[in-house]
Amino acid sequence: MSSLLKTDFNVSKYRLIAQKREANAVEIEAALEVVREFIIKKKLILYGGIAIDYALHLKGSSIYPEGERPDFDMFSPNHVEDAYELADILYEKGFKQVGTVRAIHVQTMRVRTDFVWVADLSYMPPNIFNTIPTLTYKNLKIIHPDYQRAGLHLAFCFPFDNPPREDVFSRFKKDLQRYNLIEKYYPIPVVPVKSIYESKTFSIPFKQVAIHGFAAYALLYQTLNELRITCKVPEWKTEFPQPSYSYHKNDKNITLTVDMPKAYPALVLATYNPEEVIKEMGLHLTEICEPYMDYSPPIFKTNDIHFFSTMFKELAISIIQDNLIVVSPQYLLLYFLYGAFATPADKSLFLFYYNATLWILEKADSLLNIIQKQTSPEEFTRFANTSPFVLTTRVLSCSQERCTFSPAYRISLANDVQQSQLPLPKTHFLSNSLPDVSTLPYNYYPGKGKDRPTNFSYEKNLLFNIGGKCTPSAM
């Protein structure tokens, strides 16, 4: 029997070869150079894989092989007009089949030439665009890795987002590798912050909500401490917060008493339908905050409790103690990063808690290693699958069979309804939640006879109200 030749499965190597041998490789490279000059001129901010790669280049590392064709993803405070302008520039320079189309991600416009995508421009509200930290690599502005972390945590928080290529299958491994590189080369310094704590008591529903924010940190810390005692590990010396909590419950409610920072005494909960829960709890809605990019959802505030909406999403959760529902550590990390971005005055406090949560995960990992050595593989698997400290696909339930409805799905459904002129039944869950597709950006193809679209309004479309602005409630 003849032996098979050993095959080199270096995917990156063959991708580079394929790119260089494409029939239109020269034209694509020329178009990408035009895009690069446009980014520099407009002072747009690169994000995503290319921003991570360039940030790592500044530290002598990378995630992409040298010479790989750049995939330009960029933030812009005026992404629609910028995308149209870039398309016009490419067309005027003689490139063929130039077009700008709305991407699946509704806040993104894609620019192509010769049916090859050369740029993705995503919307970032001016109040965020003008304040986020950046680095510079070869005259290109790139988003700082501190901000990039948020996008990496996001995939772990909503494992079933982006069907049929759910994040649990398409992003978990890649994003974990990228996060570890960012943590290695751009760690967030630990700067202790002294806080005054006060004991607060809250009564909350048992099944409809997940405990979030500083209270979730307290529950995860004490759960870690109990696991340490079980493993007979000496108490750790740490500068990180060590808040305590207690609770009792009945069939419907939990009474939770927890140490909270005096500066942030409100309890934070995550729930699929905040307005319904607020009504059932008999609370008074005082303020509503719009999303902060993809990193914080709409927030519904009452005097003592703030509700983070998970509407249209399936949030990963942890179960601790006697079936207490807590957000996953990844969502908690995202919360502390969001707090650092959105409230500069307390940035140091939120980053301290961010590092404290990372410390909890690090210590939990060491305890899990001990348990793994002391138990059979089957026993350890069962234990790990119920641990609140590992990545999970356990999600917060909603009131209908399906919970994940991305903006792209709702836009597609709205288009179907508009074309068929048949409204959804009033009993349909999304009957009052379809976007007005007439307010979305239009596709544009220079040289095709139609004028460039004008007067797109960010204010008139709720899908673009993502600057984190809070307004008093009329309720």
Swiss-Prot record:
Organism field: African swine fever virus (strain Badajoz 1971 Vero-adapted) (Ba71V)
InterPro entries (alphabetical): PolyA_pol_cat_su
Keyword match Transferase: yes
GO CC annotation, single: virion component
Catalytic activity: RNA(n) + ATP = RNA(n)-3'-adenine ribonucleotide + diphosphate
Enzyme Commission (EC) number: 2.7.7.19
Induction: Expressed in the late phase of the viral replicative cycle.
GO BP, sorted A to Z: mRNA processing
GO molecular function (one): ATP binding
Annotated keywords: ATP-binding, Late protein, mRNA processing, Nucleotide-binding, Transcription, Transferase, Virion
Cysteine disulfide links: none
Alphabetized CDD domains for the sequence: polyA_pol_Asfar (cd20924)
Compartment list: Virion
Family membership: Belongs to the poxviridae poly(A) polymerase catalytic subunit family. Highly divergent.
Protein's name in the database: Putative poly(A) polymerase catalytic subunit
Main location: virion
One Pfam family, short name: Poly_A_pol_cat
Role noted for this protein: Polymerase that creates the 3'-poly(A) tail of mRNA's.
